Amino acid sequence: MSYTRTVHSSTSILKMNSALQISCLLVVLGCLLGSGHCQSEAEFAAKSREIAQMFGNPSVDKYTKARNLPALLAFYEKYSSRLRLTPQERNSVNNAMRQYKAQRNQQVDGVSAQGGWLFDIIKSAISIIVKAVE
């Protein structure tokens, strides 16, 4: 009787261990990224509904909308790439946001600008964003 003995070199075992470790790492990363994407999708959907309810609802008064403009700005800055906007709409919204921020940062006697006229600056941008999230 003859016995055949397979001899594995130490380098082939190391290569196999490395490949196994890398594949496990890739699986873990895939799971983490996938769950993160799902969470961000759910967050985007929830924030979109909030924005649409706040700014798309004609029964919400102008002052409530003006008070919530920072939330709209934050939403647009975070999710602008997910909104289906034409290049012209995107440019219009970006210009309105820049103008709003410039006016908001302007101070008179050390006090930021007050009043509802700031809301009028980005009124068209609001309608574009609301249309995109609905």
UniProtKB/Swiss-Prot annotation:
UniProt keyword annotations, A-Z: Immunity, Innate immunity, Secreted, Signal
Signal peptide positions (record): 1-38
Origin superkingdom: Eukaryota
Coiled-coil blocks: none
GO biological process: cellular response to heat; cellular response to UV; innate immune response; response to bacterium; response to heat
Family that this chain belongs to: Belongs to the Turandot family.
Protein name, per record: Protein Turandot E
Organism: Drosophila simulans (Fruit fly)
